[in-house]
Amino acid sequence: MVELAYYIYCIAESAAAAQLPVDSLPAAIEDTSKLEWVSVNTLSALASQVPRATYSEENLAEHLTDATWTAIRAMRHETVMEYVAKRVTVIPLRFGTIYLELSGVEQMLTDRSRELESIIEQLRGREEWGVNVYCDRAVLLSSITSVSPVLRDLVQRAEQAPPGQSYLMQKKIETLKVDEARAAVNRIVDQIEERLKAQSDDARRLRILKVETTEHGELKAKFAFLVRRAEFEEFRDAAERQAQEHQQAGVRLELTGPWPVYNFCTGFSDRIA
């Protein structure tokens, strides 16, 4: 007989979970099982049974080195999460959250009910939206003189200086352009964060794991914003204003989402299992 464990996707209020019968949900992470709600009083965890031998801590770590195995299951996890998060308020859990026993899931829902209920209330009616900030280096360098007061002043002085001095000043200008471009990007990124944070309930600046260069330029910053559904239009308008304001500097904003609110319950989900 195959020993089973419980894979947990998210946590919701039991009343909300009742609106999503399991027959209406997407496929579970493994073909051999179906999704089920594990309910204790006012809280429910969305779960499915998985082979314990495959999902034990040691064996799961080994399976995660298989890119194909991981990609298939990560996609199933995300499909479930996006479906549920669009319909009810949930605390999304990270890929690979496992409980060996059903009693462990029930105990967690019991012991941490106040914390869970508080987090759900904070997330109610809200979505996570991503904002990626790209910069076209060539465009920025060509426009940096108009963006930077320091360079603008130096260019004016060089134009009025004698030829020999003007040449030296031009060399200095070319060197300063790189430094000023870097500083300008940092200022712009900080401003975008400040303005969009004012239009949201919370914000996170995410770590860029690797340098990404696209047709829009190099990725300079990634943000996650917690936005009330009822106020999304205002948030989007603010993002569009920032995009227009910084377009001349070669900066482009990409709005993505809505996503399950992973980045606004990390402290809890990291401790869940």
Give the ranges of each region predicted by the language model.
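An interfacial alpha-helical scaffold signature
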Residues: M1-A273
